[in-house]
């Protein structure tokens, strides 16, 4: 019965407006054809999880327990959660299994309650260093406690995505959103339990399978235009894409064509350090076949590594390349 009521309840759900908004900056989307939009529509947002079927949770029956190495356990219903001041944040999420140049990354507007506020009420032990989150479907993630309590990192128990209640496939009614960490250690959907513990006492779903425990997102950039093997018009040729360095921010994107000098691309406006940035380079290229590669530079001055690495165990690295023809 609860599952049957869930779709109707979601359609009728009214969530209070956020007390703090995060507006989309003018100029963030450069409007280049065939580049992923700066804000990813929910229907196009990547989905990676372990659920064999998407949970259909009755919002009236949903409950979150926060317990473990704390002074006070908390139990919250959905109305308890949304009665608190809600915070709106635009955050780019990425999957650790995303290959170089891959599309398992997206940027959305999330609204929710800062997890640090709930943890402050619960009072974590000084010995605790991890929060083990559990999904309705049994999935677990191990998130560094410091990432959830950091006042400069708005980790959320999110209840909306792009201004609407969370889609079922993206965690309705409540999910975690933690800037700067890969989803396998932070982005628990359909979350029902938060246990404050230690990394040496508990192990999560993917870390028990050999993936690293803390999961910071690696700086990445990709070429989206032109397509691999595609054709582009001369005068000048347009190369464009997206770059991200969550919780540090992108300062520059550079492109090299045919192993030539690195050229600085034009960047879209800055959202926050937790969002990706679009880039575009217009280059005068002779007709024929060309290969371009891209790299990013973060706000600390670190240049994206060229060293190739596979997604396992802590995320892919290397420069993305595209081969194309100028007509």
Predicted region positions:
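Structured, non-membrane catalytic/scaffold regions adjacent to prosthetic-group chemistry
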Residues: 7-327
């Amino acid at each position: 019965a609860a599952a049957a009521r869930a779709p109707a309840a979601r359609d009728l759900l009214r969530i209070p407006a956020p007390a703090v908004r995060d507006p989309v900056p003018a100029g963030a989307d450069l409007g280049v054809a065939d580049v992923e939009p700066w804000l990813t529509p929910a229907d196009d947002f990547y989905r990676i999880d372990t659920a064999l079927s998407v949970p259909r949770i009755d919002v009236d029956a949903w409950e979150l327990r926060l317990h473990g190495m704390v002074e006070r356990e908390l139990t919250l219903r959905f109305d308890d959660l949304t009665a608190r001041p809600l915070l709106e944040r635009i955050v780019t999420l990425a999957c650790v299994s995303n290959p170089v140049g891959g599309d398992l990354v997206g940027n959305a507007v999330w609204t929710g309650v800062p997890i640090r506020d709930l943890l402050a009420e619960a009072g974590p032990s000084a010995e605790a260093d991890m929060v083990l989150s559990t999904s309705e479907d049994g999935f677990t993630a191990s998130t560094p406690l410091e990432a959830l309590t950091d006042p400069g990192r708005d980790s959320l128990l999110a209840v909306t995505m792009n201004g609407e209640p969370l889609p079922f496939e993206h965690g309705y009614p409540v999910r975690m959103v933690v800037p700067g960490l890969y989803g396998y250690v932070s982005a628990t959907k359909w979350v029902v339990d938060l246990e404050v513990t230690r990394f040496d006492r508990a192990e999560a779903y993917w870390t028990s399978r050999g993936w690293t425990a803390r999961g910071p997102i690696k700086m990445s950039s990709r070429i989206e235009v032109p397509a691999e093997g595609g054709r582009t018009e001369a005068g000048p040729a347009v190369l464009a894409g997206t770059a991200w360095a969550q919780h540090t921010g992108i300062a520059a994107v550079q492109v090299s064509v045919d192993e030539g000098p690195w050229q600085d691309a034009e960047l879209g406006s800055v959202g926050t350090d937790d969002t990706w940035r679009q880039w575009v380079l217009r280059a005068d290229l002779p007709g024929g076949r060309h290969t371009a590669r891209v790299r990013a530079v973060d706000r600390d001055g670190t240049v994206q590594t060229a060293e190739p690495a596979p997604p396992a165990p802590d995320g892919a690295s290397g420069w993305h390349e595209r081969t194309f023809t100028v007509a």
